[in-house]
Amino acid sequence: MTMRPFFSAAVHHLASPRGGAMPLFLRRGGTQIFFNQGCRATQFATPRDLLLPTGRKSYHSSVATFSSSADVTNGHFMSYAMLYHDSVAFLLSNQLGIPVFMAEDPKTPVDVAKEFNLSVRGASALMVTLCRMDVVKVVKDSDDSVDEILYGLTASAKTYLSDRKDRACVSPFIDTFQTNFITPDALLESCLKGDEKKDIMSEHLEQDDETVANNARHFMAHMNAQSYCCARALPKALGLESVKKPTTLLDVGGGSAIYTIEAIQSNPNMKGIVFELPAIKVITQEYIDEANLSDRVSVATGDFFKDPLPGCVDYVLFSNIFHDWPDEINMNLIQKAYDSLNPGGKIVISELLLADDVKSSTPAATSMNVIMMPYTKGRQYRPKELLRRLEKVGFTNPKVINLVDDYDLVIGTKS
């Protein structure tokens, strides 16, 4: 059980014509490229087979077609255009706290309407959409009206949506997509020629240390929800649980240290180093102290654009780093990782990858690729692109393994 349906339901919307954007602090300074609608909309695209009509009972299955082939309809284009509204329903439900309200007992739309001062018609519309998304399931059907259906939370929704105090809850991450929207004009601006225009990520990093730290604290708190499942899956994926000798993992740009903490907790032979900006160190240390790992995890400060990475380590981890930056910077990071590793050490790149055959890419990956346009100077990579780059630097036995859901690890070994 993972949070894929909910995490993946937030990215697709961001790449749609009025998709949800990133947190408020990333608003572009001089140019008004976002506007607040006050409506709650997003979702990282659900798996393709859930998004597209199946032909069994789709809304358009009986619509007459004008194609020369009876097997070709316009349904999937219509579906993509309309999915924005599913995102709106999902985000509004999260904002209201419907999953929290339903955590203990099944509810009808009438119950939901009464609790949140909604119309029964409105509550029913939300519940039908949440049911398709596997947030709720039908406990008792009604032949008379969807307004009378009794719904209960699914097991995955109970784990990832119903308790905001639980680290596994993805709701804080979903909250970040509630207010800002990438407009078509903003997306066009980011797609136009002109290397001189600044991306929002770079503008954020150029602020004073206090502002960078405050923004980072806010950002980390929300992004931990996104990283939870990936971080928990990392030790098993890398075989860290069976390490027999002292081993050091370097987490570059590790922020809240969520990956490092999970790795170190998996094995007493593991130690960790989080490499972060000086302005971020205090915040990273707070997370380490909270996990009672200050004796095994340290914070090294520096700027990975300018400074060498700490040396004599056995793993160098880049999690969601490469998609933020252009290729020349990433090649430099790969070289720095190679230089910092002990012989036999491994570089580990965790990313939401496009498919080598781009048509087979997941909706989450293609949507994230579009999201990168206004926010960063980067993009999502294909596996073969990263494998080739590792080989160019000198890494051997490059491979790709699945981490969790749509996230993969690209791994290379230093000879």
What residues fall within each predicted segment?
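N-terminal chloroplast transit peptides
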Residues: 1-39
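Short polybasic linear motifs
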Residues: 23, 46-47, 54
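N-terminal mitochondrial targeting presequences
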Residues: 55-68
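Conserved adenosyl
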Residues: 166-361, 407-408
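Core SAM-dependent methyltransferase catalytic element
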Residues: 394-415
